[in-house]
Amino acid sequence: MLYWALIFFVVALVAGVLGFGGISSASAGIAQILFFIFLVIFVVSLIMGLVRRR
């Protein structure tokens, strides 16, 4: 899933440089959603790891 987040990020950057507003906003939106999903998964796994150590 991280692979797809990076792909959409690169597509958003390229579209932003070329000035394609519709493509850029859609790709950036998907990349932003994936970023927050990974952030939540990271925090949950971090908390689970800390709880298991105790």
Curated annotation (Swiss-Prot):
It is found in: Cell membrane. Coiled coil: none annotated. Keywords: Cell membrane, Membrane, Transmembrane, Transmembrane helix. It is a multi-pass membrane protein. InterPro entries: DUF1328. GO terms for cellular component: plasma membrane. The chain crosses the membrane at residues 3-23, 30-50. It comes from the Bacteria. Its main location: membrane. Belongs to the UPF0391 family. This is UPF0391 membrane protein RC1_1636. The lineage of its organism: Bacteria, Pseudomonadati, Pseudomonadota, Alphaproteobacteria, Rhodospirillales.
